[in-house]
Every structure is written in structure tokens, then in C-alpha cells.
């Protein structure tokens, strides 16, 4: 990549006199045959291009050029040397605090490039380093300046950044000395005080709570002042929201010093009895607990920060499990939500300056966890970009007991970021001033280019993976060096004293004051006492569940909404076949009064928007729909221009977002969860391409969506649409694994539904939207249809939208009301219910012995409605649960205890479906069809 920078530094005006004459002679040779000259010269002329005419006229003779025939080659070699220093200088940098002399031999000797000091002195400094400080007067001084710049305790990698403007800006920041301006004594003193707090807090925990896990920050103490400075600079520039994601290493220290969580609360958590009375009453720090709670080093917090210039900002450390790196897209989703205004129709209005994402990674986890690459891939996508996240690798050079050469195949932990053209700074965590330079670089780069930036903060881990672990058993040499190594607080204090910036007395006074604050806080913690074991109780709104809400929409309002949905500009050319499909939707309110699935969805969206609730829908192919059913974004067949009818509703003051997502489940679902947590008033929806692929995001279902409220008090109303149904498409396109969601279902933690009618879908979406800001809110998982999208048995009468509501139990239409004759009730959920309905409608003869109902809401189980159904059937003998999934999958294992509990005395509960299998579905469509027919037939066949 050195040619780009050479072009930045050299042009034809840099040559004059004999040198210019020789350069022109060489260029003529290059023009005749580019391969006939030295490769470095060829690269140079490739970039310089043809000389301007006035240059040729001003040149000397060829004879003059031959006087210094090799000078131009020396210049090319010098430029190559300079570029090599920029590209590879990091290899000679002092960024490892435990290794003081990283390279015994100097890289980039002049002799390797065929150069001497005298020759370098003859070259202008501007040819080598355009941005060098004014005191650099020649090429030799310029090269030495570059060597010193790129081999400090901070080093740089940006050769992978291809944008010329970015590279030029980065180069100027580094080489001009802009990054390395001296900090004021006051700021350095404040950094020392912060490092003293960081160390003092850890050492107090180490002495007081012996052997308890805390995942100490020691060895990477500088992380805290780094965060302080990122936040301070960002808030000063206008940021009003900062979202931080990090794992457990150093988390308690960040909570205490960056989030302002009082020491006494953290100490009380070590007593295994968090004292919620200790939470600050003024509300500057928000700390929430769920009813089952979590360990102290997973908890997050909110802080309302006010700086000296009266600028305020909300700082959030996201709640996080021990699943490393999975918090990343959640933080970015929250950041995007904080950046957007959603109180107008159309797409939200994004202001990237309003919110900042800071993601703290582990050196083993950053290259090791695939979710990192998934999240980095979001960084430039219009539906997900956040104007640049600042990444910090908290690099202690070890993962539990695993060395770096065992945990990654790259030189640096940060190398993955190169694929996304993210500038990288490696910095020694024992040099706080270098760390502040890295912060300045990151903040200024993001401000200018709205892109990600990475700081590789290289330190060490003073203790084992946790405080009960002895690291010397596996890394004896490393931990011998660590034990002998002074702390960064001590190193920095001695440096400031030696430079006369503070006195020894002041350094000691800082330490004394910090120790007193910590000890005073500990005195506030009540004495530990053994409380009686108590039953964990759910908050009343959670326990009570959803109240009945009115979700019907007046017929005339629906008709008007429908008209707006098919109202595109006259000049807009809708694709012919699609146009006919959309125009048929008008008949739903004129002729047949029938609403199919996709129209019901669009009407639900339109009515929710009219109610003032913003909507965000993303997923693979979600604009059109995997099954070409949705078509929310129309494309002009002649110009490609887009039109979204939901952006043009009359009297609407809520935004509508729909984006096709990248081919990722984990990062996208995590992003939408984070967006929803930050923006609880928005109906946020994620759609899987097929429900089968949702398990690629299983961590988010298990650790966050199903359990986040119980662990952290973190509410969510996220909607997940998982296409599900057995249609002979094999084991990868049949099952959304409903059994997994039902296994996780407890404590009213989410709604799991498997729907069979357009009206049911309409009402459940509207119900979810109406519940968003209420305490009862919970996530919604819907097993959505595929072939049923166009099945006439799933269409609904318009009247069902305008007069009805969501029905957890949905009775088959066309049944006899001779309830006393019924001996079998067939219960099912989802697509198999439609198969049963089709077969039932074709049956001849006596059918009064059968009653059929669909359990549309699987969880929370509608016990009351189901019990009332059974009560209508006085002679009931059999309750049959029918499913198309294998017996060890689907809803059977979950629902059979519920049915047995409420079944009338003496009535058996039976199973009809596929037998237990390891794979969810058959691969052969013929075998599938035969098995499906058996299941349906058995469910509707009377026993002899």
C-alpha cells in the first residue's frame, strides 16, 4: 500500500534541476516499457502519472540528469523505507509491559535499502514525511522521526485501510505529533488518582473477601482512565448517551469508577445479600435486580453523568452473562436506538453523534468467538451502522490458562479487525499517557469518519483467571515475571514525581484519601446475617400476566388503511404480477370481505403506527418476505426507485423501519434485542428466514430474551417470527424448534404462539404493541406459516379484525353443537391444524363424536379457556394431542402435564404424531406425505 502514501508525499513539482531531467528520462523509458525499469520506480511512476507540460519545459538536459543518475532511485528506496516503517514499525514497538526490550536489533537499517546517511541528508524531509514537525529538515531526520514515532509504547496498524482520505488523515495525526501533545499536570494528577482508586479497590477486595471471585482488573488498570477519557471527550463533543459492553474481567472496577456504583453496594454483594437500601436516592445511578438475580460481575448499571460544563449524558454498562462477546450487537442495537428519532412517519431520523458504543473485548475471545465477526460486519450496513464503535481489547495475553499461540492463528488478537478496514492502535497499559493518546486518536477518528476504531490495550493479569485459581501451575515463568513487576499506579506515580509534576507527599495523600473512602464505604455495609430461606416471588404484574386488551379496529378505519396501503404514486411502476396481487387486496373491503395473512400483517402495522407506536422489522429478506408474501418495499420496475406505503399514512407520527439483514442470526437478533431494551416503546420484530435457523442465535434466547428480566429486571417486548411447519422440505426447512422455547418457558417470561388465521396474527401483534410500555410486557415468539400464507383456510373475515380479539384457544368452524355426543376432542397447534381441518371437511357420515380446537397460544398455557372447552363436553372420553413434530419435539412434552391436570376425571390424554426421532423431519417428500396423512387420519378415526 506504500504507493498511495507516496503519491500523497511526492509529485512532479518535488523534482528540479538535474534530478528533474533524469526523472523525465526515466519516465520516457517507463512509458515505452514499464517493466524495463526498477520495480520501485515503476510503482512511483504508476502513481505520479505523466508529467505536466510546464514541467517538461522547465527541465534541464539529459546530460545534466546523468550527473546524478542514481539519485531518483535513492529517493524511491527512501520512500520505500519510510513506508515500511509505517507498515511494520509496530513490530519494533514497546507495547508489552512485561518485555522491556522487544527487539534487540534495530529494524529498517539504511543499508538494507542501499542507502547511507549522507544520501538521506540530501533528500528533502517533505519527500519522506510530509507531515513532520518543523524541526525535521532532511530525509535522515525524517526517517529517524518515523522510527521514533512508530516504535513507542504505542504503535499503529492502518496499512489495511484503503480509503485515501482516511490514510492521509491517520498519517498526519501520527507523524505530525498531534497525538502526542503533553497533557496538563492537572489531568495527569487526576489519572494518577483514578489509578490509585482502581488499585486500592482491588486490593481492598483481595484482603477483605479472600478467595471470592471478582475477576480483577489488575494489570489492565489503565482501562478505567481510558473509559473515563473516551466518555469525557465524547460528551464534550455532544454525545448524550454512551453504551458499554464488557465481560466479567474488571467489571466491578468499571461499575464502581465509571458507572458510579457505590462501593458499599458492591461490598454488600460480596456478603451474598445485596442491600437495595444502599442504592443512591438521588437517582444518579440506576441499578436494577431481577427476582432470581445474577452474580455481581454480570450486573450492569446506568449513570446520569453531568460534566463541569453542565453537559449531561446517560452512561450504561449493559447486563452481561459469561458468554463472552455476545453482548456486542446488543450494545450496538441500543446505541442505534439512542441515535434515532421515531416520532415522525417514514424511516427514523438518525443522528450518529447522539450515542456512542464502547465494546470491551478479551484477547482470546475477540478472535475466538464468531459473534465478533458477525457484529463487525454490521458496522457499515444502513440498517445497523452506529457511526462507529470504539473497540478496546483488554489484552492480558492469556485466556484462562491458554497461551496466545494456542488461542489464535494470527500475530495480534486484533487482526480480525483488519478485514473490516478498522484502524488499530496497540498500546502499553503501563503507559497511561500513551493510553490517552490512543483515546484521542479513537475519538477524533470516529468523529471525522463515523467508523469503528480499535485500541489493543496490552497488559497482563496479576492473578489467575479468578482469585481461587493459581496461575503458576500452568504459566510459572510468566507469573514469576508478573510477581516482580510493579503496578501501573506505582510506575506512573514515580514518573510524575521524577518529572516534578507532583510531589511524593501529594502522591501519598492521594493514596491515603482513597483508602479512607473505601474503608468508610465498607463501614456502611450491614453485618452479614443468615436470612431465612424465602420463596422467590414474581412481581405482581408479571405474575398476573396480560390483561384483556381491545385490539379490534373499526371497519371503516380498516377500509381507509387498506386504501392507503395500495396507494402509490401514479408515476411509480409496480412490477406487473405484483401489482395485480396488491390490487386484489382492495377487494377485501369491497367484494369478498376476506383478509389473507400478509394483508392482515400490513393492516396491523398500519394501525399500530397510527396509534403512535414505531415499528422496526428486520431479518433476511424481510422487505419482500422469504415466501414473496410481504412486499412492504416496492421497487419501480423501470427506475429501481423504492416506495414504502407505510411511510405515507395520513396523520401518522411514528416511524416504520424495515431492513433486509445480513446472513447472520446471532448478531442481528442481539442487535434487535438491544434496540428494543433501549427503546421499549417501539414494536421491534426479528424474522428468521426459516425457523430452523433461529438456533444459530440460541445464546440470545437462552441467556437474554428468556431470562433477562428474571436475572436483571430487564424488560423486553421483542417479537420473533419463526417460519415453522412440516411440508416435505426436509429437516432444515421444517421446524422452528418450538420445544426449545417451551422448555425455557416459565414465570410468564414470554409468549409462545403457533397461529392458524390472519385475524389471530393481526390481533396478537396489536396486543403486543398495546402492552409495550406496561409492566406486564414480555417477548413474543410466533411460529409463523409458510405454505399457509396462501392457504384459503387461513384467511379471515374482515369482521374478525373489526369485532374480535386474540383467542388463545380457537375452535374449529363448522362443528356440530351437539356437545353431548362428543367423545373425542382433538387439540393441535399450527399447520397440522389446517391439515386436520381440510380432512375433517371432506369426511362423510357422522362427525358429531368429534370436537376440534387449536391451541394458538402455547405459553402461557390457556388453562382457563381449555378447561371451559372440556366442560362443554359432558361425555368426553378422549383428549388427543396431535402434532406433526416428533414426539420428543414439538409441544407434547410441555403440554401433556397441563392437559392431564385439567382433564375431566377418567378422561385419557393421548398423543398422535411422529414417533421420537433424532432428526426433526424426513428428507424424502413422499415419506413425509405418507406420514402426514397417517397422523391426520389417526386423529380423526374413531377407535373400534
Curated annotation (Swiss-Prot):
Q: Where is the composition biased (Basic and acidic residues)?
A: 925-936
Oxidoreductase: is it a keyword of this entry? yes
Question: What's its catalytic activity?
Answer: N(6)-[(R)-lipoyl]-L-lysyl-[protein] + 2-oxoglutarate + H(+) = N(6)-[(R)-S(8)-succinyldihydrolipoyl]-L-lysyl-[protein] + CO2
InterPro entries of this UniProt entry?
A: 2oxoglutarate_DH_E1, 2oxoglutarate_DH_E1_bac, DH_E1, KGD_C_sf, ODO-1/KGD_C, THDP-binding, Transketolase-like_Pyr-bd
One GO cellular component term: oxoglutarate dehydrogenase complex
Cofactor entry: thiamine diphosphate
- Matches recorded under Pfam families: E1_dh, OxoGdeHyase_C, Transket_pyr
Q: Under which EC number(s) is this enzyme classified?
A: 1.2.4.2
Q: Which domain of life is it from?
A: Bacteria
Q: Write the record's keywords in alphabetical order, separated by commas.
A: Glycolysis, Oxidoreductase, Thiamine pyrophosphate
The record's Gene Ontology biological-process terms are: glycolytic process; tricarboxylic acid cycle
Q: Where do the segments described as Disordered lie? A: 915-944
Select a single GO molecular function from the record's annotations and give it.
thiamine pyrophosphate binding
Subunit structure, briefly? Homodimer. Part of the 2-oxoglutarate dehydrogenase (OGDH) complex composed of E1 (2-oxoglutarate dehydrogenase), E2 (dihydrolipoamide succinyltransferase) and E3 (dihydrolipoamide dehydrogenase); the complex contains multiple copies of the three enzymatic components (E1, E2 and E3).
The record's similarity note reads: Belongs to the alpha-ketoglutarate dehydrogenase family.
Q: What does this chain do?
A: E1 component of the 2-oxoglutarate dehydrogenase (OGDH) complex which catalyzes the decarboxylation of 2-oxoglutarate, the first step in the conversion of 2-oxoglutarate to succinyl-CoA and CO(2).
Name the record gives this protein: 2-oxoglutarate dehydrogenase E1 component
